[in-house]
Amino acid sequence: SLYMSEFIKNTPGNGKFLYSAFQNYTNTFMKLEQFRAYVIEAATNTDIVEISISTRPDCIKDSYLDVLLDIYNTYHVDINIELGLQTANYHTLDFINRGHGLAEFIDAVLRIKKYPFTICTHVILNLPNDTMRDTIETAKILSALNIDIVKLHSLYIAKNTKLSYQYRNGTISICSKEEYFERVIAFIEHISPDIVIERLFSRVPEEDAYFSNWNTSWWKLQDELLDKMM
């Protein structure tokens, strides 16, 4: 079976699988030969036309990119690399214990740009301590780096985590829903029009979250945002 992968069907009725996503965890952290085997397993499915690999910016190595290039050329599947940046603010990255800074992200992007792959970046616009200025700066940096795709996330706080304790005792705060809308709009206004925005909100099972989307369903949030943008 494919390692942490899922399939997304094409248009209704044709039954073709198009997309294999290695989404969970840091996929380029596994051993190289194991990584090669899992990706080849996906690539040999003739219905798949794109493989998406999620990983950390500080876990991008040329040897893994070379493996993906070989698979790209051999099996004629597109390759998309998904990197979690979350914010361009180093102090916030340190506060949430990301374990990398902006420099590692830029290095990863420059490495990947040498290959015929697309790059998707994940960004959270309501991290503790981040401001509107950080939102705009993040959008500008992604534009300068010619990122292909962006997925926006609204922060959720998992139960029984350090962040949940800090939120509960008031050490940190999360911006309001209205402020989040303003940040999304500002991000869109400052991001390059050549960059595709694939997601505006994220969601998790309610039973796992101490805080999630201001107790509002993601689709209601999206409708509210679109109404605000009209």
Regions found by a protein language model. Name each.
Residues 128-144:
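Catalytic cores of alpha/beta
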Residues 84, 90, 115-133, 154-159, ...:
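Conserved strand-turn element in the central/C-terminal portion of the radical SAM core barrel
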Residues 14-18, 45-51, 75-79, 113-118, ...:
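Short, well-ordered coil/turn segments that N-cap beta-strands
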Residues 1-7, 11-32, 47-60, 77-104, ...:
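Core AdoMet radical
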Residues 45-46, 71, 103-121, 172-194:
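Alpha-helix-loop-beta-strand connector modules within alpha/beta enzyme cores
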Residues 143, 149, 157-230:
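Auxiliary Fe-S-binding modules of radical SAM enzymes
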Residues 8-12, 38-46, 66-78, 110-114:
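Acidic (Asp/Glu)-rich catalytic clusters
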Residues 32-40, 61-72, 93-96, 135:
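Distinct, well-ordered alpha-helical segments
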